[in-house]
Every structure is written in structure tokens, then in C-alpha cells.
Swiss-Prot record:
Belongs to the complex I LYR family. MZM1 subfamily. CDD domains: Complex1_LYR_LYRM7. Keywords: Chaperone, Mitochondrion, Transit peptide. Assembly factor required for Rieske Fe-S protein RIP1 incorporation into the cytochrome b-c1 (CIII) complex. Functions as a chaperone, binding to this subunit within the mitochondrial matrix and stabilizing it prior to its translocation and insertion into the late CIII dimeric intermediate within the mitochondrial inner membrane. Modulates the mitochondrial matrix zinc pool. Its main location: mitochondrion. The keyword Metal-binding does not apply. One of its GO terms (biological process) is mitochondrial respiratory chain complex III assembly. One of its GO terms (cellular component) is mitochondrial matrix. It comes from Aspergillus fumigatus (strain ATCC MYA-4609 / CBS 101355 / FGSC A1100 / Af293). This is Mitochondrial zinc maintenance protein 1, mitochondrial. PANTHER family: COMPLEX III ASSEMBLY FACTOR LYRM7 (PTHR46749:SF1). InterPro entries: Complex1_LYR_LYRM7 (IPR045298), MZM1/LYRM7 (IPR050435). Residues 1-36 form a transit peptide. Interacts with RIP1.
Amino acid sequence: MASQTAVTARSAYRQILRATRIAFQDDFRVLVAARQEARRQFDEHRREGIDTPMQINHAKEVAAILRHNIVQGVRDSNDENGKWELRIHDDIERGDNDSIRVGGKKVKVDKPCSA
């Protein structure tokens, strides 16, 4: 029977794989590179140690950033102006720009983007 840490680590790894699939959907080269890097990082930290919970938490945070904050752009080769088309999917975090509207006043941040 697998330990709870191993189960949590596998779950975090699967979260990263799903997040890379969403973030790099039409970019096979970057998708493969991101997955290889994730595999390399998990292989480097294969043995359970004191910092294992921190490593698992880091993996979950990476997955969240990939899923919610990475937007890829594709340059339109037919357009002489070189316009870019952004691939914004349903999981992308969209801000409301309230801090821009404040205009010189101090802005209180209630929570970080990853929360």
C-alpha cells in the first residue's frame, strides 16, 4: 500500500500534466519540453525527505500558475502587420483592473493571485 505522501505526489504530478495540456494545447514542442521538465524534477526528488511536502506544494502551485496565468500567442503569418492572436481559455484568470482605477492611492491587496 502506498504512503499518503506518494499518493499526494502522484496527484500533484497529474495536476501538472493536465495543466501543461491546457496551457500548451497547440504547441507540441513546448508541451513536450514542459512535461519532460516536470518528469525530471519529480525524478530528482524521488526519495521522500524533510522537504517533500514543500516540493509537492510547489508542484501544485506550478500547476495552478500554468492553468490560470499562462496565455500563449500565435503570430498571424498572413497579416503584414504581424498581429498576434492570444489563446485565452476558460481557466485563465481575468483581473478587473481595480488597482488601475485608483489613481495614485495606495492599493490593498486582499489575496495573492494564486489563492
